[in-house]
Amino acid sequence: MVKSIIYSLTALFVLSGCSLNKKTMTNLEIIKSTYEGKTSEENGQNLAKYVAEDISWTEAKGFPYAGTYIGLDNITKNVFNRLGSEWIDYKFTPEDYVASDDKVVAYGTYTGIYKITGKSFTARVAHVWKLKDSKIISFEQFVDSQTVNDALK
């Protein structure tokens, strides 16, 4: 009797395509996890978990941290550490996402206060992410950098 129940359950899983393994996250779910964690630390951990070793990260021309950085260490040093040390409450608030094949676009608003001047800003922004085999291989930022630069003066 027990054997027939086990065989029946096994057949049910096989025939229904069910698996006992965890579901692979979609590209959209991966990118959302880098923005929508409970804390900035959680977002950072999710980013680190999903970036390819040789990720290419491009900050927009005209933006204070403009340039292309390769690898998470370079990105952390040239972008995230500076955002954390030079700004108060700097954040990206996603409005929505668009996903197609290997690309995900997140668009929304940056806000923050520049520590040196005490000036705040709001800027519209879009992030274009590209993934391969569930790893983030590139990021490109498009932003109204004028409002950001105005806060620096």
Where are these regions (language model features)?
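Short acidic-aromatic low-complexity motifs
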Residues: M25-D54
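A solvent-exposed, acidic/Ser-Thr-rich amphipathic alpha-helical stretch
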Residues: A48-A99
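Generic anion/oxyanion-binding catalytic loop in active/binding sites
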Residues: L20, E36, P64-Y65
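Bacterial Sec-dependent N-terminal signal peptides
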Residues: M1-T26
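A beta-strand edge to alpha-helix "cap/lid" segment located at domain peripheries
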Residues: S19-K23, K77-K153
